[in-house]
C-alpha cells in the first residue's frame, strides 16, 4: 500500500544520506604516488642544464667520450588534499622528487671518466574534482600548477684530474590527470591516474589514506 511505499522511500533516502555523510566526514587525505617520465618541458630543461656543465668537462662526445648506464628513477610524490563541504571538491598540494643519471667513458678504451645527475624537486598547489565519490569507489580529475627546481651536477675523473660542477634552474611545473580511479575500503584506497606532467606521463598509481 501507499504507507509501505512511503516507508521504503524514506528508508532508502536515509541510507543514501548516511552513505554520503560517511564520505563527507573524511575531510583529510594523504597519498603517495609513483609515475614514470617527466613533462617535455621538464625533461628538456633538465637535459639542457645537465649537458651544459657536462659538455664543458667531457666535450659532449666530441673528444671520444660516450654516455652509458643511463638511469631514470621516475617521480615519487607526496600529496595532501582537504575535502570541502562539497564532497566532490578537494584542494591541496603536491611535493615531488625525480632523478636521472648517466656515466661517461672513453669510446675506445671504455674507461670510466665521470658522471652527471639531475634532481627535480617540485611544489604544486592542486585541485581535484570527483565525478563519482562513493564510500568505496571514486572517479575524479586532478590539476596542479607550481614550480620545479632542477639541480644538475657533473663529476669528472678524466686524465687523472677530479673536477665537479653544479648548476640550478627553476621552471613552471604542472600536472593534468584527466581521469583517476580509486577503490578500496573506507579509509584506505589504491588508485591509478592517466595524465601528463611532473608526476608522470600516461599513468601513475599509488595509495592514499583518508581520515
Which ranges hold each PLM region?
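Short glycine/proline- and aromatic-enriched beta-strand/turn motifs that initiate or cap beta-hairpins
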Residues: 21-84
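Outer-envelope beta-barrel architecture signal
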Residues: 24-30, 87-91, 135-141, 186-188, ...
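Cleavable N-terminal export/targeting peptides
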Residues: 1-27
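Flexible, solvent-exposed loop segments that connect beta-strands
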Residues: 42-69, 97-121, 149-172
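Transmembrane beta-strands of outer-membrane beta-barrel pores
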Residues: 34-40, 95-101, 119, 145-153, ...
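Predominantly the C-terminal beta-signal and adjacent terminal strand-loop region
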Residues: 23-25, 39, 43-45, 165-211
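Residues that define the transmembrane beta-barrel architecture of outer-membrane proteins
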Residues: 26-28, 70-76, 117-123, 137, ...
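Gram-negative (and chloroplast) outer-membrane scaffold detector with strong preference
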Residues: 71-154
Amino acid at each position: 500500500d501507499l504507507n509501505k511505499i512511503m516507508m521504503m522511500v524514506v528508508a532508502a533516502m536515509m541510507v543514501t544520506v548516511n552513505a554520503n555523510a560517511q564520505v563527507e566526514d573524511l575531510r583529510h587525505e594523504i597519498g603517495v604516488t609513483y609515475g614514470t617520465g617527466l613533462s617535455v618541458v621538464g625533461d628538456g630543461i633538465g637535459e639542457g642544464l645537465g649537458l651544459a656543465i657536462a659538455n664543458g668537462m667531457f666535450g659532449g662526445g666530441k673528444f671520444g667520450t660516450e654516455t652509458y648506464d643511463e638511469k631514470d628513477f621516475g617521480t615519487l610524490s607526496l600529496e595532501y588534499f582537504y575535502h570541502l563541504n562539497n564532497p566532490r571538491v578537494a584542494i591541496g598540494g603536491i611535493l615531488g622528487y625525480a632523478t636521472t643519471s648517466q656515466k661517461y667513458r672513453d669510446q675506445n678504451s671504455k674507461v670510466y671518466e665521470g658522471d652527471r645527475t639531475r634532481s627535480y624537486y617540485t611544489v604544486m598547489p592542486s585541485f581535484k574534482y570527483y565525478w563519482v565519490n562513493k564510500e568505496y569507489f571514486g572517479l575524479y580529475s586532478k590539476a596542479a600548477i607550481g614550480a620545479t627546481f632542477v639541480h644538475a651536477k657533473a663529476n669528472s675523473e678524466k686524465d687523472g684530474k677530479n673536477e665537479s660542477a653544479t648548476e640550478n634552474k627553476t621552471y613552471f611545473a604542472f600536472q593534468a590527470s584527466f581521469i583517476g580511479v580509486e577503490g578500496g575500503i573506507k579509509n584506505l584506497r589504491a588508485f591509478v591516474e592517466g595524465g601528463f606532467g611532473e608526476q608522470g606521463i600516461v599513468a601513475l598509481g599509488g595509495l592514499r589514506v583518508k581520515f
